[in-house]
Amino acid sequence: MTTIKHLAIIMDGNARWADRHNLTKSEGHKAGADKIRELLPEFINLNIPYITLYTFSFENWQRSSSEVDFLIKLLSIYLKNELDSLHENGVKIKVIGRLNLLRSSLQKQINNAIELTKNNNKIKLCIAFSYGSRQEIVDACTKIIAHGKKQVSEYDIQHALYDPEMPDVDLLIRSGGVYRISNFLLWQAAYAELYFSQKYWPDFNKDDIHEAINDYSKRKRTFGKR
């Protein structure tokens, strides 16, 4: 049992893991997707109500067309293969990002997954895809302006984000030995505790999750207070 309400993960290191094992980048990304399937039951057991996974950043559109195409295909395959199991296990699916950049068939698949699982309440799995936090904040402000607001509050921005119900991030984990948050949940992670692991994402296991949570439990969160 943990007090964490929102765990966010930057699943980094798939391509470098593949290089280390003389595999293709595509095989590395597939191993990363398989790791989500492996760890999700542990997230449920830990009773963490909200999980956000950074799967494809807005900046990732700048990668080679072959890698981008594979990552988009991988999301489609994941939803196709895992949706029934996720639904049966009470997982509520949310996908955030500039989804209008995706082909219409994938947008429909995403919407179907969201609709099917909308009443589930065991855990909320948020997939950040074609996502950038700066872009999210710009989109939120654009929405607010379109509604004719003259003055803008934090409340207005919060309720114009991709998922207004998303709680603030308690713990943000990044695998892969990189020490930055890469335009991920900048608004929601304002007071998040950060945990960086040297392990590549495909090598991550439930012991690593427990280690991160144990480290988090030892920290004193002051939120700017004393």
Swiss-Prot record:
GO terms for molecular function: ditrans,polycis-polyprenyl diphosphate synthase [(2E,6E)-farnesyl diphosphate specific] activity; magnesium ion binding. The active site is at D12, N60 (proton acceptor). Keywords: Magnesium, Metal-binding, Transferase. The keyword Cell inner membrane does not apply. NCBIfam families: uppS. Homodimer. This is Isoprenyl transferase. It comes from Rickettsia prowazekii (strain Madrid E). The gene is uppS.
